[in-house]
Each structure stands twice: as C-alpha cells, then as structure tokens.
Amino acid sequence: MTTELLDRILSPADLRQLDRRELKRLADELRGFVLESVSRTGGHLSSNLGTVELSLALHYVFDTPHDRIVWDVGHQSYPHKILTGRREGMAHLRQQGGISGFPKRSESEYDAFGTAHSSTSISAALGMAVASRNAGVQRQHIAVIGDGAMSAGMAFEAMNNAGVTPNINLLVVLNDNDMSISPPVGALNRYLARLMSGQFYAAAKNVGRAVLQHVPPVLELARRLEEHAKGMVTPATLFEEFGFNYVGPIDGHDLDALVPTLQNLRALPGLQFLHVVTRKGQGYKLAEADPVLYHGPGKFDPAVGIQQAKAPARKTFTQVFGQWLCDMAERDERLVGITPAMREGSGLVEFEQRFPQRYFDVGIAEQHAVTFAAGLACEGQKPVVAIYSTFLQRGYDQLVHDVALQNLDVTFALDRAGLVGADGATHAGNYDIAFLRCVPNMVVAAPSDESEARLLLSTCYEHPGPASVRYPRGAGCGAAVGEGLATVPLGKGLVRREGRRIAILGFGTLVQAALGAAGQIDAMVADMRFVKPLDRELVLELAARHDALVTVEEAAIMGGAGSAVLETLAEAGVTLPVLQLGLPDAFIDHGDQAALLAGLGLDAAGIERAIRARFGALLA
C-alpha cells in the first residue's frame, strides 16, 4: 500500500497545503492505513472507515487545534488521530502503554474533549463556545455526533440550551450512517447544501424574517412554505426549532461537497447544523456488507476477512447470561428483557429472536431504560435490564428514585464489571459495588464462576425487589454450567477451601485467584457471593477462627466489598487485622485484562505476595 501523501502529513497544517485532488488521493491512502492498522491490532473498524473524508474535511477547513472538534463516543476518531501526529502510535492502539482508542485530552492537544460514553459532544462543545465568548476568543466549536448518539436525551438537552445562548459559534455535524443517499439527494442536494450554507442565503433569510415579523400571518405562511420547500430534499426541520441553521443531508464521502459546505458554515456566526450521510465500512466491501461484525474486530487478515472462530472451550459470562435469560423466559412469561443499544454486547441476540414481543432495545437511553423497567414492574412484569456496569452510572438517579425507593422488582445484569481491557478507563466497571451497596433495598451479587453466575441470576430474579448481578468481560474459568434454574439462600456465602491462620474473603471471579494464592500459604477461602446483604454470620465466624482477614474484589477498594466487611467488624466490636485488595483510587488505562490485573497485584501471585508482605509473621 502506497502512502506517499500520508507520509507528508505530520499535522493538519500539512494537510491544508494540499489541493482538492490530492485530498481525494489522501483519503484513499488514509482509509487503507486504517484498515491495515486495525487488522494488526484489533479495534473499531467500520465506524472509522466511514469517517475518513469527514475527518479530512474538518481538519482541512478548520484551524485545529485552535478550533475545537469534539468527537462524540470517539471510537470513530482513528483518522483524526492519524492526521494529528499519532500515526506511529497506531501500531500499539489500545495496548498497554499505547494510544487510546478514544479521544483523550492528555494524549494530544487536538483531542479537545475526552469521550467514550455517548451523546456528550454537544454539551461539551457548547460549554467551550460559551467559555470562548466570555474570554473574547474567536474560534469555532464543532461537535461530531452519530445518529445513534443523537437518539439520547442529553443531545437534545444541549441543543435546547444552545438555542437560548446568544453570541456563540457552534457547529453540530450529524454523522448519519444508518441511511443511504437516495438518487434525488445527489448533485441537486450538493448545490442546495452549498446554497443554504452560504452567507447570502443566511442574510436574506434573516432580513426576510425581520420584515415579516411585522406581518404575522405572512410570517406564518412563509415559515410553512420554507418547511415544504426544504421537505422536498431534506428531513424535517426539527433542528431549526432549536435555533440551528440546518444544512443537508450531503454525502459524507464526497469531498467536493464537504469542503465548500464546511467553508461556508465556518463563515456563518451562531448555531449551524450539518447533516452528513456516511457508510460504515466504506471502501472495504466485507465491512460494508456486515458493519456489525467489523465494528470491533480482533486481529484479522484483510485479504480474507474475519474467519469463523472455533467455539471457545470456556463460555463467556455474557453467553451464560444470554442462555439463562432465554431459559427463565421459557418458564416465566412475565420476564421482559431490556437493553440500551447493547443487544450483541449484552448477549440478547437469541432472546430477541425467540421472544421478540418481550425484547426492548430502548436505544442509547439508560435513564429511560431503568424507569421503563420500573413502570413494567409496577404492573407485575419482571424486567431484566442488561447493561454494562459503566453505563448504569448514567441511570443512577432512576435506579435510586424510581426503582429502589419503591422497592420494585427489577433485576440488573451488569456486564463488563471490573477491568475491561482494551477499552480502558472509560468503559471499566469499577464502581458499581460502591454505588449500589449504599442504596436501600438493593441486592448486590458477585458470582465467582459461570455456574455461580447462573445460580445468582436466578436468585436475584426470584428476589421480590431490586437486585443486581455483576460479572466481568470475557470467558469464565471453565466451570460446568447446569441447565436448571436453582437458587441459593440470599446473602449467604460458602467456604471453598479450609486453611490455617488467614481467611481470604473473595467477591466475584477473583475467588479463583484467591484459591491459587491460598494453596501456597495454606489460607482459608470463602466465596462470599453477595456484597449485600453481606453474610454477617460468616464474616464474624471467620474473624473468630482466624488471626487475619483478606478481602479480594475486582472493584474499587473505596466503598467496596472490603469496606462492607470492615463495617461489619466495627459494628460487632471485633478488632482484627484486615488487608483489602482491589482496584486503587485511580483510573486504569487500557491494556490486556490479565496483564492489568497482574500489574495491580490481583492475580494469584500478586495476592500471595501481598499477604506475605503484610502477614509474613503469621505464615512462619
């Protein structure tokens, strides 16, 4: 693959030296480089192949980094990273010590705002625009947001706020990759986009409105005529109701349309909205045909594409959940499955196919998902909300106010609890234990393996109140998983290994690492199963029988399961040395999950090492 032009681009300043014809050649080189890089490291592919021309046009037209570009979600920012001096870093994308797969302020001055969760870009760009206005700085502020992210309420809250904020420069670019451009939206629409984004059109429209303000009936007629005229070639003018000048849709892969339209919009003050249509996987036929498969692939050969992988010997926790959900739905027709736009990731594909009337993908709307579940529970349904731990943070008020306060029967299946590997700190589920166990009525369960996951899912589902089950990303330890729907006593743990002077209390899958460590130091290991209600009787029994306790969890130490054990001991007046092992008070960067855990001392060797360092005298 030739990269003659790309080799010359060390920053956007170099990009702006190219003519339009060279820009098109560069787009081909950049797209090929993205494909080659991601095939070697893994990462997000389809979305990045779809934003090549848009990334080029934005950096070509706007004076970055002086002008601010905020990429919503951010997994489509690889072309942006390559164009802003991080081409070499793509060799270690999302690897420990390498560059992030998302925009990150500490990584580059061109990353104006860190993103990874959805629908934040317009709010952030609006805040920047107001700050620039207040400081008397002239700059442009651009929020690039996808059609999926635009479905979330936060995006509309931001536009509503922008509509009443005077004297700011804000451009929202809607990257719509969920529709195709029909034939009428070709050359004609390119011309109309350039016309509507031009200064003459904007000035004429403003003058006309000023005059017509004095003739209200004529003003209303003019409004309707304008809407009908625009309706011939564009979507409804919803965004203009928020105060934005709407332009588009235009072909997001046509630089001859993108560049002049963006140049026109740059010259206009106020609120501008550009609707561009792109195609996920653009330029790579396999990704165009199946953008979901190529959304976030691992390493693969671009010449042959992603090959059908052999079924892993060990099931993932997501698969265990998906099978349990279908089995429970067979038995209980009240069960309803809910996901906020994470059907594949949360394991609901089979459930949707088998129970379509009881499956609800509510879109990127975590707040709505939780309260929707609360409404279902009020009427006797049994909702199960399948959600990543990190995304439940976005629905926390609803969990407290709408579910727990009313003690409603809602089960939360929390995938990606703990470290998540390549996606890094933005997607890590480190905080759910701390923010859930403090909520009255809430049950918090943490299974140690695949079999326990099925047992605890059934137990929490049968519990008449709010309950959560947290489990990590990836494969389990290979434990056999039964087909039944048995339950276990609520709030009761069990002893996995007897030992001598030290007792290790494990919460979640780190029980396996604890067992490995215990074998080297003859320690006792308890699988606590529940953080809340905590097995108080077992904790006090172990404290009475041992000289020291160790708590182990793949979650934040502050406020976590270890804190619950300390609170129990303090309440009972028991004084005993306790070592808490878990995730530190820090954001953990991307990298291999196992390597990250080992680096934090949360593998078997690390746990043994920590216990020897703290309680060596007890092991002598």
Swiss-Prot record:
Keywords: Isoprene biosynthesis, Magnesium, Metal-binding, Thiamine biosynthesis, Thiamine pyrophosphate, Transferase. Pathway: Metabolic intermediate biosynthesis; 1-deoxy-D-xylulose 5-phosphate biosynthesis; 1-deoxy-D-xylulose 5-phosphate from D-glyceraldehyde 3-phosphate and pyruvate: step 1/1. It catalyses: D-glyceraldehyde 3-phosphate + pyruvate + H(+) = 1-deoxy-D-xylulose 5-phosphate + CO2. The keyword Transferase applies. GO terms for molecular function: 1-deoxy-D-xylulose-5-phosphate synthase activity; magnesium ion binding; thiamine pyrophosphate binding. It is an enzyme of class 2 (transferase). Homodimer. This is 1-deoxy-D-xylulose-5-phosphate synthase. It comes from Bordetella pertussis (strain Tohama I / ATCC BAA-589 / NCTC 13251).
